[in-house]
Amino acid sequence: MTDILIDNTATETVRTLIRAFPLVPVSQPPEQGSYLLAEHDTVSLRLVGEKSSVIVDFASGAAQYRRTKGGGELIAKAVNHTAHPTVWDATAGLGRDSFVLASLGLAVTAFEQHPAVACLLSDGIRRALLNPETQDTAAHINLHFGNAAEQMPALVQTQGKPDIVYLDPMYPERRKSAAVKKEMTYFHRLVGEAQDEAALLHTARQTAKKRVVVKRPRLGEHLAGQAPAYQYTGKSTRFDVYLPYGTDKG
């Protein structure tokens, strides 16, 4: 489990939020590795020996740029957002793609199994709901803490199948800005090994009603070595589309 250092300045709202996740409260940072820091109104991810931190902030940075300047055109085509209103993001991570999908007006159910990452994302969604510029989009995201492959079958029984299951498994990309490389370093050290890709894709194809959309680097291998039905390719990113079992179109 991940350590969390709770500063004296942490608000009661933040303290309540972090109690929802199996984290280990500590009185000082660990000697090495990563940890969460709760201070003021924010939860951040820190790496021992580094000054910078990672937070989920949908109102600034890359998230703000994509929200105000666009940048979701390819993903919109891949999910066919006008025809498929419900999406389950089975690999939510820090929620960037969940937020883009929600900004398209889709109802997004986001799954994140790592407690520290889920805590960061939950905190980011909470703050986005308080910001007039992001609250409408954030309201379209419903976060589930747990393993998507384990939770999706049960959720289908109560909510029915989603139109789309979206996957963005971790993938080592070479051409990254220094800031993104540092953030991914934090993230990889925290999360460790990726999920069983074949099992995840199998469950996704059992779950989706219309299609499974997998985000990959433009020149990256197919997920679990399985060729998609078709794909949408951009300058640096590719979206592979798989059809649910027993269907021939999505």
Curated annotation (Swiss-Prot):
Domain of life (superkingdom): Bacteria
Statement: the UniProt record of this protein carries the keyword Methyltransferase: yes
Coiled coil: none
UniProt GO cellular component terms: cytoplasm
GO-annotated molecular function: rRNA (guanine-N2-)-methyltransferase activity
Residues spanning the membrane: none
A Pfam family matched in the record: SAM_MT
Catalytic activity: guanosine(1516) in 16S rRNA + S-adenosyl-L-methionine = N(2)-methylguanosine(1516) in 16S rRNA + S-adenosyl-L-homocysteine + H(+)
Protein residues bound to S-adenosyl-L-methionine: 96-97, 168
InterPro entries found in the cross-reference section: 16SrRNA_methylTrfase_J, SAM-dependent_MTases_sf
Keyword tRNA-binding part of the UniProt annotation: no
Function: Specifically methylates the guanosine in position 1516 of 16S rRNA.
Family designation: Belongs to the methyltransferase superfamily. RsmJ family.
Name recorded for this polypeptide: Ribosomal RNA small subunit methyltransferase J
Organism of origin: Neisseria meningitidis serogroup C (strain 053442)
